[in-house]
């Protein structure tokens, strides 16, 4: 009995103890607070998580840096040359002295230059462009002035028809040898016909276009010819001849059919020089503006080089001019100066500083004819504003005697005078009373150093020339460009070149 009671008591105590434990576990630590003494260096949970995140990012970056980067393709310029030949009309040799021209300055540093380009006689726009393009003198290419007589009573002002050019221009020379060529606004490059017209040329010249517009138009056509975006307004041109020539010439295969000769003429500097004079602020501002337009053009060309040019092509930039510019003091109306009586027996084709006089309606008797011409020459000699040269008196170095287009007498004005069609009260008058031009050109460079012009030649990444050039002439430009393109000059062209690689 005692043992049974003891067993019951033990069981009761065990039950009570178990119930107490259950009650404690059920109510948990409610009401019980634990505190921890902070130690130096303790961090919050947020800080620890942020450090872990940053460590994970750093490990990822290190892994990326360890990866080998893709090799960058670099143009070494050891492929074919692509020549961009830009002629800037009226770019006088001293214009850079008072103009901000970072682009021209860079060309001077990276390549070669001279402000002593001595143009061939006559120092006029169309003859000079013809001389540069053909590598021959006016007696051979036939462009003896900006206004020429092609026959009795047939006068062409600012000739544009390429058929008037009597020697092969470089756009034909290059195309014939497989070089795809674009030529815009270069005198006598319009309306090309024959077997080897340039791949791209214009049918007409727009005198109102700015340099920026001309550059953009050429760039659009260049892009289109390279398989890029079509030009906004595609110019009329001949566009298939280069492909036919390309298949037959090694020079073409080097270019893969892409353009390798681009030729342009820019006019803004000449225009401002004529209107305001060569030393006017407006003229220097035009030099700066053209410099900026060229910088933008060539920055774009280089940015798109892999599309525009053949693989590893070397960009050659050739900047030339046709002539400089002199201050104009007086205009001369030659018909007014000679008078109606003398003009009955003369056709005169005059432009700027040069006039070609052709006799007409002379006496049939040789003796009478000789007497008449002698009297005529005597009257001409009384006019002090120009010198009169017979055909046999033309300086040989001018190479000016063309059998049909050079006059029986050549009149060359003094520096500072220009022939004009406008008529004033007197035959000699101020520019403000005539065309309102204050710049003149056409004078022999040996008489007016202001006819001298600027030349730059540089290449990227490899320049074909470095350092300062001395005096250079225009006759060598054709052969120089041919040499850089790896082709032969035209038959009859001067073969001397600038000292290019």
What are these regions (language model features)?
Residues 199-226, 283-292, 338-354:
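Acidic, His- and aromatic-enriched active-site or binding-groove loops in soluble protein domains
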Residues 14, 24-39, 136-231, 249-278:
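His/Asp/Glu-rich, glycine-adjacent segments
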Residues 34-56, 64-80, 92-179, 190-199:
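Active-site nucleophile/metal-coordination loop of metallo-enzymes that catalyze phosphate/sulfate
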């Amino acid at each position: 009995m005692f043992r049974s009671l003891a067993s019951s008591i033990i069981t009761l105590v065990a039950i009570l103890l178990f119930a107490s434990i259950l009650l404690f576990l059920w109510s948990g630590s409610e009401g019980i607070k634990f505190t921890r003494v902070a130690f130096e260096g303790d961090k919050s949970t947020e800080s620890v998580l942020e450090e872990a995140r940053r460590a994970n990012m750093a490990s990822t970056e290190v892994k990326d840096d360890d990866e080998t980067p893709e090799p960058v393709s670099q143009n070494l310029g050891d492929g074919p040359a692509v020549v961009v030949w830009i002629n800037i009309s009226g770019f006088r040799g001293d214009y850079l002295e008072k103009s901000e021209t970072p682009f021209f300055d860079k060309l001077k540093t990276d390549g070669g230059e001279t402000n002593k380009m001595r143009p061939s006689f006559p120092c006029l726009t169309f003859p000079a462009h013809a001389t540069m393009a053909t590598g021959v003198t006016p007696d051979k290419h036939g462009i003896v002035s900006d206004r020429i007589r092609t026959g009795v009573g047939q006068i062409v002002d600012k000739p544009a028809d390429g058929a008037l050019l009597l020697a092969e221009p470089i756009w034909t020379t290059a195309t014939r040898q497989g070089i795809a060529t674009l030529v815009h606004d270069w005198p006598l490059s319009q309306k090309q016909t024959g077997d080897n017209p340039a791949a791209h040329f214009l049918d007409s010249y727009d005198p109102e276009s700015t340099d920026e517009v001309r550059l953009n138009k050429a760039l659009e056509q260049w892009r289109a010819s390279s398989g890029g975006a079509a030009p906004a307004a595609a110019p009329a041109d001949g566009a298939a001849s280069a492909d036919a020539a390309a298949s037959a010439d090694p020079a073409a295969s080097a270019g893969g059919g892409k353009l390798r000769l681009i030729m342009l003429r820019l006019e803004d500097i000449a225009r401002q020089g004529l209107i305001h004079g060569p030393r006017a602020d407006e003229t220097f501002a035009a030099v700066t503006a053209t410099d900026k337009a060229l910088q933008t053009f060539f920055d774009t060309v280089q940015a798109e080089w892999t599309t525009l040019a053949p693989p590893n092509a070397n960009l050659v930039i050739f900047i030339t001019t046709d002539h400089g510019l002199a201050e104009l003091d007086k205009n001369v109306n030659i018909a007014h100066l000679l008078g109606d009586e003398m003009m009955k027996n003369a056709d005169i084709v005059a432009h700027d500083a040069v006039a070609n006089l052709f006799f007409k309606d002379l006496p049939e008797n040789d003796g009478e004819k000789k007497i008449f011409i002698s009297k005529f020459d005597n009257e001409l000699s009384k006019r002090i504003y120009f010198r009169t040269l017979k055909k046999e008196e033309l300086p040989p170095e001018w190479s000016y005697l063309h059998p049909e287009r050079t006059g029986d007498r050549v009149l060359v004005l003094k520096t500072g005078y220009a022939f004009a069609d406008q008529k004033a009260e007197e035959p000699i008058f101020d520019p403000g009373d005539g065309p309102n031009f204050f710049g003149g050109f056409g004078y022999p460079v040996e008489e007016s150093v202001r006819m001298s012009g600027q030349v730059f030649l540089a290449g990227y990444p490899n320049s074909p020339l470095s350092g300062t050039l001395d005096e250079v002439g225009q006759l060598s430009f054709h052969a120089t460009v041919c040499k850089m393109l790896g082709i032969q000059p035209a038959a009859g062209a001067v073969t001397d070149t600038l000292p290019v690689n």
